[in-house]
């Protein structure tokens, strides 16, 4: 359920950076069922402009189901999502489907994100910032998994979003590519003051990037800064493979 309710919270600092007084999104008591099976149980959190939140959890723990609620794909939930204003939300799904029967260049895919939106963000600046100029004339089907993720990130950026939701964005990358991707995310947030919510099942790769980590296994088990999370007894009991 959408609400335009304004939320009043004190100014705080996250990762040493001054954050907006008001969160741009507040998730309040979200519960979701698939049939009789509860996949999300009473999840609540908020995010401010310029903040990076990682939703960490095991496979099958409800991460993807939660982000599908946040971006409006799944609307059959209990609870409320509050916005201080109606935001532009860009979504990067975990599995991008490439249709081999409809060839598409990288440039065409990026331009398609601009059509009918009146977007003012300079497409060329985004292409240079994400460093995909050399990929523009190539077919999407020819790209590696890591290259596709960079292109999809650029596509999100040209929408001039307030919030980008990334579902397991680095699951197909090696360690070096993961680190480079997370560094790029941090730079984009600093430059454009956008908010990021991303899912992962690997804490170690998000340590240098996230302001906050929310550990979920249907319900929220613990949350805090990456440093606080790794010291949490609840985290170690639920996600021992990440310790």
Curated annotation (Swiss-Prot):
Ranges for domain ABC transporter: 25-242
Residues given in the record as ATP binding sites: 57-64
Q: Which PANTHER family match?
A: METAL TRANSPORT SYSTEM ATP-BINDING PROTEIN TM_0124-RELATED
Native organism is Anaplasma phagocytophilum (strain HZ)
Q: What does this protein do?
A: Part of the ABC transporter complex ZnuABC involved in zinc import. Responsible for energy coupling to the transport system.
- So which domain of life are we looking at? Bacteria
Its cellular-component GO annotations read: plasma membrane
Where in or outside the cell it occurs: the entry states: Cell inner membrane
Catalysed reaction(s) here are: Zn(2+)(out) + ATP(in) + H2O(in) = Zn(2+)(in) + ADP(in) + phosphate(in) + H(+)(in)
- Family designation: Belongs to the ABC transporter superfamily. Zinc importer (TC 3.A.1.15.5) family.
- Subunit structure, interactors included: The complex is composed of two ATP-binding proteins (ZnuC), two transmembrane proteins (ZnuB) and a solute-binding protein (ZnuA).
Any single Pfam family the record assigns to this protein:
ABC_tran
Which protein are we looking at?
A: Zinc import ATP-binding protein ZnuC
Q: Which UniProt keywords apply?
A: ATP-binding, Cell inner membrane, Cell membrane, Ion transport, Membrane, Nucleotide-binding, Translocase, Transport, Zinc, Zinc transport
